[in-house]
């Protein structure tokens, strides 16, 4: 896909995405997906055929890519075909794969404690504490600004996150203490001209932008390796662990739903499948077989009236 050929088409697609108020992350993903499709068919997407769509979907399947990523790529291609190019005949042939319902991978409280203890710097401890202590996504952590922190009420405001929704999350005393330490040590050479409330808590190297989620993921994996956690967890496991540990401690699932920003309670309810503390507290019916069966007490009948 040459820049000259793509430029007008890409501009039109961006305009269509802006008109529908798609967030920046979604737009980047859609553009990347369409570039991948164009590179595969070796031509501009506006000349694609039904056979091109079929071959591309087969190609993605043959690469061993996860169903989630295949769906994500084809969603971007579908947007281009259906919205920008008005090729409904082609977009209708893009199928959505049903994703297997996997149990979220979580860390135990001991593993989480070890992870935070071995974080190599104040910045790393704070970043990971925000992920676990507030149940934040990676993108939510790195995009925090001064204005989002309410130290008086111990609340962090998350603005326009997934699904373009705002929500409030808890701010623990330990995390607030780390935030205050970090603010004193945080590099400020790039803050000139930026109002205090708009300053990034974790600025990137170039200035003007926050640190990247890739940098945050690297810090997480370094800490996980140092803590001896070998079960393949990712940074998102901190969010899973936040929800699971709250559930095990008896927090109402509807409050957890609000803290995570889930639209549907069913999405939050999946953590009941990994709350090992709750599962272990339930007595198996097999163990009860050997116990003497309790007979129901007979109610004393009132004597008949004289």
Residue ranges and their predicted role:
Residues 1-306:
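Conserved catalytic core of the tyrosine transesterase superfamily
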């Amino acid at each position: 896909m040459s820049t000259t050929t793509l430029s007008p088409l890409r501009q039109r697609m961006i305009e269509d995405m802006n008109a529908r108020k798609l967030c920046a992350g979604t737009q980047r993903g859609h553009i990347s997906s369409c570039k991948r499709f164009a590179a595969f068919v070796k031509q501009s997407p506006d000349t694609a055929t039904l056979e091109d769509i079929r071959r591309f979907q087969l190609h993605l399947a043959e690469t061993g890519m996860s169903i989630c990523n295949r769906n994500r790529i084809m969603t971007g291609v579908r947007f281009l075909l259906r919205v920008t190019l008005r090729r409904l005949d082609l977009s209708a042939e893009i199928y959505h794969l049903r994703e297997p319902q996997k149990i979220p991978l979580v860390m135990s409280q001991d593993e989480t404690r070890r992870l935070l203890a071995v974080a190599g710097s104040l910045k790393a401890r704070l970043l990971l504490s925000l992920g676990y202590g507030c149940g934040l996504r990676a993108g939510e952590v790195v995009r925090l600004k001064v204005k989002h922190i309410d130290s008086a009420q111990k609340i962090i405001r998350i603005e326009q996150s997934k699904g373009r929704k705002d929500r409030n999350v808890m701010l623990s005393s330990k995390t607030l203490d780390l935030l205050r330490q970090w603010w004193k040590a945080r590099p400020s050479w790039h803050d000139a001209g930026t109002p205090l409330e708009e300053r990034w808590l974790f600025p990137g190297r170039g200035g003007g932008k926050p640190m990247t989620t890739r940098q945050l993921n690297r810090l997480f994996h370094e800490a996980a390796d140092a803590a001896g956690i070998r079960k393949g967890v990712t940074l998102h496991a901190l969010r899973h662990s936040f929800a699971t540990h709250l559930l095990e401690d008896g927090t109402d699932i509807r409050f957890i739903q609000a803290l995570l920003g889930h639209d549907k309670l069913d999405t939050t309810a999946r953590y009941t499948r990994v709350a090992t503390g709750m599962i272990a507290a339930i007595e198996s019916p097999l163990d009860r077989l050997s116990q003497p069966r309790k007979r129901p007490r007979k109610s004393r009948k009132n004597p008949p009236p004289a």
